[in-house]
Each structure stands twice: as C-alpha cells, then as structure tokens.
Amino acid sequence: MMGLCLLEGASAQANERFLIVSWGDVIFGRQGVSKLDTSEKVRQAIEGWRARGVDKVLFRVDDFRVLLFHDVYVDPNIPYLREWARISRRAWEEGLVDTAVNVLKEAGIEAYMWITITDEGAPPEVLFNYGKGLSFRAWQSRFTRENTHVLVCDRSLTPNQRQFHWGVMEYAYPEVRGYMLQTIRAFSDKFPFDGVFLSLRSHSPPPRHADQFGFNEPVVREFKKRYGRDILRQDFDLDQWRELRGEYLTTFLQEVKSHLETTGQKLAVGVQQGEYIGPPFGNMRIQWRRWVSEKIIDELFVGHITRVRSRYPNRAQRGWGYLQNQEEGLGLPPIEEALRRDYGPLCSKHGVKLYVEPGNFYRHHKQPAYGSGAQPPEVGKKLVAEILTIPGVTGIPVRYDDVTESDGKE
C-alpha cells in the first residue's frame, strides 16, 4: 500500500513462518490469485499458504483505515489512483477482510491485523512524490485535519512560526490515544483477528533533524513539572526529553493491551533495531525492554523499518541527527549480536515471542546513499542462517511471492 513495498524476508524454515500481506501493494502489478482483489482469490491464496507451511499472517488494513477515516485526494488523470480507489472500496463493501480472517482461522493460520499508528497523512501539497509521471496519492486523516495541534511540533514559541511533522501524532495527548484506539477497534472488534500488529512506519516526509519535533504542550508541561526546565526557552537534557516522549507511547500500548485483554486478542509491535524510534521520526526512546519485561506486548518484531533511503531516492539526503539508524547501521551492533545478547534472552525470560525481519538488515537496493550499493544475495542468506541458530527467535518471514500463486486469469 502507498508505495511501501512488501518486506522481504526469507523462505528458510524457522520455528514459525509468518507472512506479511501488504494488501494495498499486492493488488497492483500482479495477475491471478496473488492479486488478492476479490474474496475468491483470497480463499485460493490461503489454501496455498496453508500448503506451504505458513503459521501466521499479518494482514494489512491500512488501505481500509484510509478509506474510512481519511480524506483521499485522488488525481483522476492517474490510472493507478483511480484503480486503487475502485478496488479498495469494492473490497471493503464486499467483505474481503472478513473473508480473509475467517478463512485463515479455518485453515489453522493465525490472523493478525496490521495497522500503522504513525501515518496520518498530509495535505496534497506536502506529501512527497516519486518524480515526473510517478505521482502518488495524498491522504490525511480527518482527525488531524480538525486537530492540527496534535501533530508533533517543533520548538517554535508562537503558532505562526510553528511547524508540524505531518502524519505523526503526539501520544502525550489523551485524545490522540483515544482516537487511535478507536481506529484499531474499528477492525479488531469487527473482525475475529487473533491479534493486533502495530506498525511504527510512515510515509511522512522526514524531519530536517532527528530532534526537530516533539515540543507539544503536554510534553513541555510535564518536563517542567519533573525537571524544572522550560524546554521551549531553556537548555535541557535531551535524553530526559527523549525518554519522556517514549513514555507516552508506552502508555498508549498499555491502553491498547487493556482493551485486547477483554477480547482475548494479542498485541504485537514492529520496531527498528535499537533503543530509539529512528527514521523518519526522530530520537524518541523506544521502551521495548519495558514492554517485554512488563508483558505489555505479547510479540516483538525487530527490524520493521520504513526504508526511507532505499525506497525514496528523493529523500536520501535527509537522514541526519539520528542516534541510531538501522538502515545505515548507525550506532547499532550487528543484529545477530543484539539478538543473542539483548532481544533473545529478555524475550525468552518473559515469554514474549520474538520475530525478526532479516531482509531489512542487508542492502539489496542500489542507491547512492549506501556508497558501496547493493550487497550480493549471499549476504542475506548467510544472515538468515545465522539468525535461525539464535535462541529466543520465534520466527522469520516468508516472501509473499514464494508462497502465493501468480498465474491464472484476471
């Protein structure tokens, strides 16, 4: 969906084999069953997934989230945009999501809804494009259009100076947490998903600097209360500020978890490697250790990133000021080392399932930002083999194209 391509994983056998179905992506450029644009194709695809040993499916509902809760600006002169609108609305009205969830469960495959909580869109004049002839649709949630102040903002003192990070909300606001929980429930309550997977990725244009945004009024007020510093007018401890902002995301996860406990559904979260949220957001602390040790989450997916540099060449120069950046390997140990030393032991101790996306830890795109360019496939195969030997790793993804039939008539 929306230009974020399918995450590439590996076809090797792990303890569990999970499949990422980015529905809005697979409905384009494909034929036959793999297109998944009708309920019947979904049924046929699931039969193939079961036969090929898929244990869990993360089914992306973001296209339908946009359809229901956002204003979408569709250029009628671009066939791709017209087709997206037509297929998405028809699929929703014909109950494609309900079919997918129920058929998955009948097949003995766990069904998780994948929803993004950091991607509320932007006005048409703001959202990036791919260049001439490759325009991309723009969308913006009605909630953020009507409540612009809830978007994370910069350190400007006056409203006329203030800049916002389009699409990214500040979870310090109770109304933001309430809105997003209701958005999640629009799918998790309506359909019998086994769990909810929260994605921390975004199509939003990145900040000019990793610490540019995060100075909303609730954060300013709480920081002053705790530390006696006005972060709009005085110098302050950046690490304390980054940690405080991360606490609000943790609060949101606790609220989601509390609701899911009433429905018997599990909570999974996808993050980049490391202690910070990273590109294209900033240096907000990701309190994954607390999430695991307090069992706020049931499953942790490591390596789940936006890939702003490899996917979007027009944004390749924007990675600046990040303390940790998985895409560039900045400030991070090799993922194998982190899994053995940090993630694996802690997740095993507290009974939290640990999944890894190996395809996001080696370079298989040729982009100038990487200097040496793409790495050979052998690098990825070696990495997968190593990850499969690490205690505590529950599973890795299988590639969509490896388990889904692509032939047949439209």
Task: Locate predicted features.
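Active-site-adjacent "subsite" loops/lids of carbohydrate-active enzymes
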Residues: 16-39, 113-190, 365-376
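An active-site-proximal structural segment forming one wall of the substrate-binding cleft
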Residues: 45-54, 100-105, 168-203, 386
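Substrate-binding cleft of secreted/luminal carbohydrate-active enzymes
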Residues: 56, 296-315, 326-336, 342-345, ...
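Aromatic-lined carbohydrate-binding/catalytic grooves of carbohydrate-active enzymes
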Residues: 54-92, 209, 306-329
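Aromatic- and glycine-enriched glycan-recognition loops and surfaces
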Residues: 34-52, 79-105, 178-182, 247-254, ...
